[in-house]
Amino acid sequence: MEPEKTYQYLEDLAEKIGISIRYEDLSGELTARSGLCKIKGRYLYIMDTSRDLTKRIELLSQCLSQMNLEGIYIIPAIRDLIERSR
């Protein structure tokens, strides 16, 4: 699967399970590089815009690997990617 399609699928899956993704340039003085947080009961994943697509796929896969995805159909290639990220 092309990296762009892979990332789009991961992004759609995150939204489907209630994770909003916000893109921010974190290359300044912050030590954070991307991550999941919970604000007022809602999940928010802050993605560093300075990360390349391969790293974004890795980061979002790691995030999703920690979530309960039971009962959600995920195409095999994406499910394998998420499983390998654990």
Task: Report residues per predicted region.
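Auxiliary, metal-adjacent structural segments of Zn-dependent hydrolase domains
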Residues: M1-A32, I39
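C-terminal structural segments of small proteins and small subunits
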Residues: L60-S85
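Solvent-exposed, non-transmembrane amphipathic alpha-helical segments
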Residues: Y9, L30, S34, G41, ...
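Anionic group-transfer/hydrolysis microenvironments
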Residues: L26, S50, L64
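Active-site scaffold of zinc-dependent metalloenzymes
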Residues: T31-T54
